[in-house]
A protein has these predicted regions:
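Netrin-like (NTR/C345C) domain of secreted extracellular proteins
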Residues: 2-14, 22-35, 96-98, 122, ...
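Mixed-charge, low-complexity intrinsically disordered segments
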Residues: 71-107
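N-terminal post-signal-peptidase region of extra-cytosolic proteins
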Residues: 41-51, 86-97, 136-147
């Protein structure tokens, strides 16, 4: 289990709070009006192969996708220690700063069909968080993210980080989702292929 997902959000107050991804909205997205679209940029680790992504993950599972909901995530910070030990020590974050650093996410419920690796159980449901979604009439789009609910496949292979308290996200938005067709697995349409592993059977033997 990961101790904490850690993304960096840059807010109006220019305080930087360490929460794996670095995320910031585009500079002109300050106060978007209802009906507008805001593009969010995020940096994720890249693995270059399915095998490397699987090795980095806490859980690798085949799932059926269920309903989703919108959520707002706020950065958390640790102000313990001295200024030299911890750059967050002594940083005064106002409610306005915290609101400016909030990130819109889509949280999707998935049902576990098969466990390739990890501690999850077949038949259980978990929630997977992805950047982007809609909030107050504004659509937020993270450029490399394909929301689970939009993928046209009855089953998906998800390569997940576990942050505890039932919180999961993909190791990255492109390499963390694979389309399942029978025993075969493939990258999302438009995503460069990582052909080192092409089937669930190969994954089972590897795990």
């Amino acid at each position: 289990m990961r101790i904490h997902r850690n993304f960096v959000a840059l807010g109006i107050g220019s305080a930087v709070i360490a929460l794996g991804v670095s995320c910031t909205a585009l500079p002109d997205a300050g106060n978007p009006s209802e009906g507008s679209v805001v593009y969010v940029s995020a940096d994720y680790p890249e693995y270059g192969s399915i095998g490397a992504a699987v090795d980095s993950a806490d859980d690798v599972v085949v799932v059926e996708v269920g309903p989703s909901r919108q959520a707002i995530e706020y950065p958390e910070f640790d102000d313990s220690g001295t200024d030299l030990e911890n750059p967050q020590s002594g940083v005064d974050i106002s409610d306005e700063d915290l609101e400016a650093m909030a990130v819109v996410t889509t949280v999707t419920t998935v049902v576990i069909v098969e466990v390739i690796s990890g501690d999850l159980e077949v038949g259980s449901s978990i929630e997977v968080s992805q950047l982007g979604g809609m909030h107050r009439g504004v659509t937020y789009i993270e450029e490399s993210t394909t929301l689970l609910e939009t993928v046209d496949s009855p089953e998906l292979l998800l390569i997940l980080n576990d942050f505890g308290d039932g919180k999961y996200d993909l190791v990255n938005p492109e390499e963390g989702i694979l389309v399942v067709s029978g025993d075969g697995i493939d990258s999302l349409p438009g995503v460069g292929g990582h052909s080192d592993i092409n089937s669930l059977q190969e994954l089972r033997k590897r795990s």
